[in-house]
């Protein structure tokens, strides 16, 4: 079941990957967790459907900051 965060839905796809969608199901992108020597970080990637590719938005120390990129 998706988790709603201020009109954005997060669908957990795996231990370290979430799909970010609008409530109507339109996919905005993905957030992936990864390890660094300083601790876990979160990478936000916007999906460009017409170009069939992803564009990195940024890397963040807090998952909510990564999700905020899609608002």
Mark where each language-model region is.
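Negatively charged, low-complexity tracts enriched in Asp/Glu with abundant Ser/Thr
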Residues: 1-23, 50-57
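A broad, structure-centric signal for solvent-exposed, well-ordered loop/edge residues
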Residues: 17, 27, 38, 64-67
């Amino acid at each position: 079941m998706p988790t709603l965060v201020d009109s954005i839905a997060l669908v957990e796809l795996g231990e370290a990957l979430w799909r970010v969608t609008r409530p109507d199901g339109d996919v905005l992108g993905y957030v992936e967790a990864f390890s660094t020597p300083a601790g876990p970080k979160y990478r936000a990637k916007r999906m460009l459907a017409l170009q069939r590719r992803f564009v990195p938005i940024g890397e963040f120390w807090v998952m909510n900051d990564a999700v905020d990129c899609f608002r």
